[in-house]
């Protein structure tokens, strides 16, 4: 009864610590305008009206682009134009801290007007509108100095950096591309994707041309990794689950459950091996006491394992097989961090991309409690149980700063682990410890 009241109170106060999608912030200084979204940081020069630097803000601050005469400079017969007045910053969805929907920066060069528009979404996409009363050239950005990773496609320009695994995709709609510049006469809009090499985001940015783009991009050295066929198979399966459930939170839980069901035979084999070893433990201890010589002791143990049909290494082998699989699954969930932030709430969590104790404490409690009971089920003595419990308390705190979507995966996996362990040990009639036994208390009369 008390536990129910505590949980009810915690659930009531949790939304206080949660927040919705952050607005776009604009910071102006003497030399530049900085635009900050949840995952992007743009630096625009005031005098030239060009993009100076671009950073992504997932997993720290990563420098993706720096200006090298390729930041959407406007050239008239090869001469760069400079703005003739202070740029104008406008936006949609004005709030106290910035703009909720989009921000536009307007540069006036006299006979040329240029507008950068940045929307508040997960796609790393922005727009550049050019309006000119005479023919001019506009430079296109590159994320790598190595031009061998450039690709010139119909209506598109691509630049890829294998070291940072970032790219630029610029849609120019029949603009003539020559030596890194585009010909503009009249009005022209460029759609620009600048960010990490994530195919789901590329598909959202350019859905109508996605297949053509990927076909060209995979031929760039370093664009693909050797495990991409498996990895992206899981990525698109998760995408399908999200479309099915209409929510990333439910998709994470369903994804975790399905994968654990598929991997159950491996886990069952591992657990069965551990149970068999537990049954042999009295005989193993007797052999260790009887034979002090390491060689004779090893021979006796091998004979015991052979007669019992037990392979002591099989449990570890099954665990080693599962580890890379779970690391791959973790990477799949992590892949969607940007989309967690812009895909609505899940139960009481408004933003599955947010991390920290205030967002993850409930997952922390669930994980620790589930791990506690799993440890009791699998332990033979209080000393071993305490070691496992201490680890199960410390280990989740290492994840507390991660996005809630990742912690949801971890917590769901821990709950499924508890359920599977309980079922397996019940099936084989293996008794674990009770809380009273753990604390060294006598059994109830």
Curated annotation (Swiss-Prot):
Keyword hit for rRNA processing: no
Assembly mode: Interacts with the Sec translocase complex via SecD. Specifically interacts with transmembrane segments of nascent integral membrane proteins during membrane integration.
Membrane-crossing residue ranges in chain numbering: 6-26, 248-268, 313-333, 352-372, 388-408
Protein known as: Membrane protein insertase YidC
This protein's UniProt keywords: Cell inner membrane, Cell membrane, Chaperone, Membrane, Protein transport, Transmembrane, Transmembrane helix, Transport
Entry's Gene Ontology cellular component terms: plasma membrane
Key word Transcription present: no
Signal peptide: none
Domain of life, per lineage: Bacteria
Record NCBIfam families: yidC_oxa1_cterm (TIGR03592)
InterPro entries: Membr_insert_YidC, YidC/ALB3/OXA1/COX18, YidC/Oxa/ALB_C, YidC_ALB_C
Pfam families in the record: 60KD_IMP
Biological process according to GO: protein insertion into membrane; protein transport
Membrane-protein topology: Multi-pass membrane protein
Family: Belongs to the OXA1/ALB3/YidC family. Type 1 subfamily.
Molecular-function annotations in GO: membrane insertase activity
PANTHER family assigned: CYTOCHROME C OXIDASE ASSEMBLY PROTEIN COX18, MITOCHONDRIAL, OXA1
Physiological role: Required for the insertion and/or proper folding and/or complex formation of integral membrane proteins into the membrane. Involved in integration of membrane proteins that insert both dependently and independently of the Sec translocase complex, as well as at least some lipoproteins. Aids folding of multispanning membrane proteins.
Cellular localization per UniProt: Cell inner membrane
């Amino acid at each position: 009864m008390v536990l129910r009241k505590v949980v009810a109170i915690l659930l009531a106060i949790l939304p206080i610590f949660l927040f919705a999608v952050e607005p776009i912030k604009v910071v102006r200084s003497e030399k530049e305008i900085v635009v900050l979204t949840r995952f992007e940081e743009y630096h625009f020069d005031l005098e030239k009206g060009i993009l100076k630097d671009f950073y992504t803000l997932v997993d720290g601050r990563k420098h993706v682009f720096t200006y090298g005469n390729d930041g959407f400079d406007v050239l008239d017969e090869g001469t760069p134009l400079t703005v003739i007045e202070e740029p104008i910053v406008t936006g949609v969805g004005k709030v106290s801290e910035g703009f909720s929907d989009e921000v536009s920066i307007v540069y006036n060069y006299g006979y040329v007007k240029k507008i950068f528009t940045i929307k508040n979404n997960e796609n790393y996409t922005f727009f550049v509108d050019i309006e000119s009363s005479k023919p001019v050239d506009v430079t296109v950005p590159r994320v790598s100095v190595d031009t061998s990773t450039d690709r010139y496609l119909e209506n598109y320009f691509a630049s890829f950096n294998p070291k940072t695994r970032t790219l630029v995709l610029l849609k120019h709609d029949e603009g003539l591309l020559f030596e890194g510049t585009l010909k503009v006469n009249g009005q022209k809009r460029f759609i620009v994707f600048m960010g990490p090499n994530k195919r789901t985001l590329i598909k959202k940015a350019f859905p109508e041309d996605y297949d053509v783009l990927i076909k060209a991009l995979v031929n760039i050295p370093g664009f693909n990794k050797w495990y991409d066929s498996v990895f992206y198979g899981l990525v698109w399966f998760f995408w399908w689950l999200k479309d099915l459930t209409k929510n990333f939170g439910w998709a994470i839980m369903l994804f975790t459950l399905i994968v654990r069901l598929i991997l159950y035979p491996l886990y069952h084999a591992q657990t069965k091996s551990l149970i068999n070893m537990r049954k042999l433990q009295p005989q193993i201890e007797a052999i260790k006491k009887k034979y002090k010589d390491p060689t004779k002791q090893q021979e006796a143990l091998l004979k015991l394992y052979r007669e019992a049909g037990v392979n002591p290494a099989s449990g570890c082998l099954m665990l080693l097989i599962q580890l890379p699989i779970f690391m791959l699954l973790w990477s799949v969930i992590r892949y969607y961090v940007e989309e967690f932030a812009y895909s609505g709430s899940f139960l009481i969590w408004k933003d599955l991309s947010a991390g920290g104790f205030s967002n993850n404490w409930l997952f922390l409690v669930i994980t620790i409690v589930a791990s506690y009971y799993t440890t009791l089920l699998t332990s033979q003595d209080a000393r071993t149980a305490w070691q496992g419990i201490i680890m199960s308390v410390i280990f989740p705190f290492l994840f507390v700063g991660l996005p809630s979507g990742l912690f949801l995966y971890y917590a769901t996996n821990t709950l499924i682990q508890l359920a599977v362990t309980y079922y397996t040990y019940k099936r084989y009639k293996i008794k674990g410890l009770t809380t009273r036994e753990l604390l060294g208390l006598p059994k109830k009369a």
